[in-house]
Each structure stands twice: as structure tokens, then as C-alpha cells.
Amino acid sequence: MANNIPIGSPVRTKAIINRYFVKAKKNLGQNFLVDQDAILGIVEAADIQPGDQVIEIGPGIGSLTEQLLLAGAKVFAYEVDDSLPEILHNELPKKIGEQSLNDRFKLLLKDVLKADFQNDLAGFFDMKQPIKVVANLPYYITTPIIFALSESDLHFSSLTLMMQKEVAERLEAKPGNKEYGPLTISVQTEMNVKIALEVKSTSFMPRPKVDSSVVVLTPLQERPKIENRKHFIWVVKMCFSQRRKTLNNNLKALIPNAKEREALISKLGVDPRVRPEDLTIDQFIEIARNIPAK
């Protein structure tokens, strides 16, 4: 009977935790998702279809993995906790079936930030076809993972990521919003951002201190023309180095000459007293174009 209960249900999760003596590791940011509606919401937000190739980051005890596989996906999972493979290989076949699991699931004990996607996925995924990324991310590595994925050579069609609500709001922020900053600009020059659903802290075991959001990121069809992305990101970060100061003040470190600085601000068509959070992405691109790359 227990085999018919989803891994992500509170009763099954508790049974697995007790059977395998699992303890959520704070240093890995582990919180097990025990809200089946939220789990199915992630699968729906990612628009998982039979045959989809999915990278899952941090499968944990398999709550989301199970539903991805039941939806027909082929799943390649990255995990850093070496105590979890036994659980995944014992529990997933109960609803998926041993043969189907062998054909459609592969687990690699590796930090995704050290991933070599081309080599890791070769032989399991068709690298000519789009790949989806789905993950319930540990809060402490959310931003590094987003940067790593957006800058990788991975041909992905979407990233569906559970993250801290505050980070999700930063990704979706518009100019003039206090959450708008370097992360916002870096992501929005590469991807469309959509918050698909909110997930309360009560949906996790153990319960975190903050709520979460599920964000869907999809590559822009037409990206802004940025000649040197590394230089652009550096300029943006410099402009936000003292975010409560005016643009004119923040630009002093980049353009020491007052007349040159005034000319650029005039070219942007903004008040010198404007703060960086009020500038559009196009205006940041224009600033970067007028500052020599180092």
C-alpha cells in the first residue's frame, strides 16, 4: 500500500527518513519538500512531456524525481550527498519500475557547479535536442547555479527552479523596484523570467524560515547586443556598488573626468541624481559601451 503513496507525501517522507536514518544537512541547505500540490505544480510549470530530457539538481530522496519520471521524462540528476543514492535506487522503482528507471534515470554524485555537461550527459541525452533543468535549489547556491547554467554551453529550453522568494523577486524586478540589481540585469539580458507559483515554508521538512517561489526562466529569442558580457556585468556591479548613492557618484570610480561623466549622463537622458536602480537595461548597456574594457 505504501508503494502507492508518493515519496513527497508527509507520511512517506517520514517513513523514508526513519527507515534510512536520514537527517537534513544544514551545510547542504537540505529541506525535503512534502507538499504534493507544490511538487506537481513544479512539474506543470516546467511543462514536462513524455520524452523530455531533464536535468534535476539535488534530487534528495526523490520526491520531485518520482513525479518527473511519472510524467514521462528522462532524468539526469546531480547530487552531492553520498547518503542519498541508496534511497533513490531503492524507493524510485516502487512506482516507476526497475527497467523503466534504468532506462530513464541516471544519478551522478557531483557538484553541479563543477559539471562538465557535454561529458556528463553524453551517451544518456541526445545533446542535439533541448534540455530542461528542474530543481528545488538550496538557498545558499541559488545565484551561483543560475549564473553557471546561463553561461554554460548547455542547449536548454527552460529552467524551472524553486528558490527563496526574495531571490525570485530580485530576478523578476523592474527598474525603480528596490529588488532590482546586478542579478536582475544579468538574468534578464539572457532570459525571460516568470514566477509560476509560491510555496509556503510549511511545505518543507524541516521547515525553513522563509517562503519559496518557483521561477521559470526561458532563453530570450532576441538578446540585447552586449559586446563584452564580462565587462558589462562588471560595469553594472560597479554602478550598484553604493546603491543608495546617485549614478553620478557611482560613476566616479569608472569615469574620473567630470566632463566625460556629465556627457555620458546627458547622453543617457537621465537626471545626474538618479539612482542605479532606476536605469533600464538598455541604459546600462550604453554605459558599458562608453567605458573601456580592462
Curated annotation (Swiss-Prot):
Annotated function: Specifically dimethylates two adjacent adenosines (A1518 and A1519) in the loop of a conserved hairpin near the 3'-end of 16S rRNA in the 30S particle. May play a critical role in biogenesis of 30S subunits.
Residues bound to S-adenosyl-L-methionine: N31, L33, G58, E79, D111, N136
Listed GO CC annotations: cytosol
Name of the featured protein: Ribosomal RNA small subunit methyltransferase A
Record NCBIfam families: ksgA (TIGR00755)
Catalyzed reactions per annotation: adenosine(1518)/adenosine(1519) in 16S rRNA + 4 S-adenosyl-L-methionine = N(6)-dimethyladenosine(1518)/N(6)-dimethyladenosine(1519) in 16S rRNA + 4 S-adenosyl-L-homocysteine + 4 H(+)
Organism: Lactobacillus acidophilus (strain ATCC 700396 / NCK56 / N2 / NCFM)
Gene coding for it: rsmA
EC numbers: 2.1.1.182
